[in-house]
Amino acid sequence: KQRNMSERDFDWLSRMWSKKLYKSQKEHYFGKLFSASANMPSFQSYFPEGKVLYMVRDPLQVIPSGLSLVTGVLDKKFGFWNQPDDLRKRYLLRLYNALKELLIRFHEDWINENIKKSKVKIVTFNRLMGNFDNLMFEILEFLEIEKSEEIEKLILETAEKQKAFKSNHKYDLEKFGLTEEQIKNDCQNIYSTFLSGDF
C-alpha cells in the first residue's frame, strides 16, 4: 500500500516558505522541488496561486544523472559498489523505476488535463542552454515580474556565458544495468510530448 504524505509535506513547505518570506521581507519565494512533479494536481490544489517552472531534459541525461548522484552518496557512506551483485541490481532497478515514475506521472497528469497549465511553464534544457535570454524574458512575463535594466543586463551577460558551456558529465549506462534503447522506449511519451520542438 502506498502512503500519500503530500498534505503533511505541503503543510511543512507552507510553513517554511512563510518564514522565509517574513524574514526576507520579499514578495515571492522560489523553491527548487524535485518531487512535486509526481503529484502536481495536489500541489496546485494546496498552492492555487503558485506558479511552476517545470524543467524538461532528455531522459538519457536526467536518469543517469539521478542514478549517479544517489549511488555516489550511497557509495561514500555504505560502499554501494562493493555490495553483493544481486543487491546492487535490485536497488538500481528500483531507483531507475522511481526516477522514471517522476517523469511519467507529470506527463500523465499533463496530457489528461489534470494540471492547471496556465500556472505551469515548461522549460526545456536545450532552450535554457541555447536561447537563455529569450527564455528568461518569457519566464519573467509568466511570473509577472517587471524586467528592470539591471535584470536585463544580467540575463544578457549570462546568455553569452551559457553559449560556451559544455557539460563534462559522461555516464556509463552499462554500469547501471541500462541501455539507451531501454530508456528511450520507457520514456517515449516524454520525448513525443515535451521534446519534439513544441516548447
Explain the meaning of each model-derived region.
Residues 1-10, 21, 28-29, 67-122, ...:
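PAPS-dependent sulfotransferases, especially Golgi type II membrane carbohydrate sulfotransferases
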Residues 11, 41, 57-60, 133, ...:
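Non-catalytic, well-ordered alpha-helical scaffold segments
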Residues 20-49:
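Flexible, glycine/threonine-enriched loop-and-boundary segments that flank and lead into catalytic domains
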Residues 30-34, 56, 125:
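Short His-Asn-centered micro-motif
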Residues 36, 55, 59, 99-102, ...:
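Hydrophobic alpha-helical segments and helix-packing faces
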Residues 38-39, 61-65, 129-132:
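Short catalytic/ligand-binding loop motif for oxyanion handling, primarily in non-cytosolic enzymes
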